[in-house]
């Protein structure tokens, strides 16, 4: 199993190096992260595998999407940074005001759980509680990555059609 994962890891690294477009680079990097995490999981190194997968997918979401959108935008428009910062601040304040009472009541009414003081039980409990959140986070990041790539690719095609039709 490890030999097959190492071979596929090498193949994914070659795919990243030889990517002909940012889309294939993003896909190859996603496979590289997944295979590296599986190789670490096969060696019973659980926490770095989880962190590796989340960092790779989150980093790809930021770097590849930004570079693809920047390369695909034929006529970049300036962004009103002041309005964006004000709207973001307003959204954070609104979410904080709405969620504060619910978090406070949840923490006050929920009985505290008693843990065994053995470290193995505590680590098992942390992993058991966090595994579903990790799976949800990976699915959301992957869906977001490919949906934004799809939107950017259609935008590029639309912009090319618009520019060629005006001449």
UniProtKB/Swiss-Prot annotation:
GO cellular component: mitochondrial membrane; mitochondrion
Localization per record: Mitochondrion membrane
Alphabetical keyword list: Electron transport, Membrane, Mitochondrion, NAD, Respiratory chain, Translocase, Transmembrane, Transmembrane helix, Transport, Ubiquinone
Origin superkingdom: Eukaryota
Gene Ontology molecular function: NADH dehydrogenase (ubiquinone) activity
Record-linked InterPro entries: ComplexI_Subunit6
Membrane topology: Multi-pass membrane protein
Spans traversing the lipid bilayer: 21-41, 45-65, 78-98, 132-152
Root EC class: translocase
Record bears the keyword Translocase: yes
Enzyme Commission number(s) from the entry: 7.1.1.2
Name under which the protein is recorded: NADH-ubiquinone oxidoreductase chain 6
Highest classification ranks of the organism: Eukaryota, Metazoa, Chordata, Cephalochordata, Leptocardii
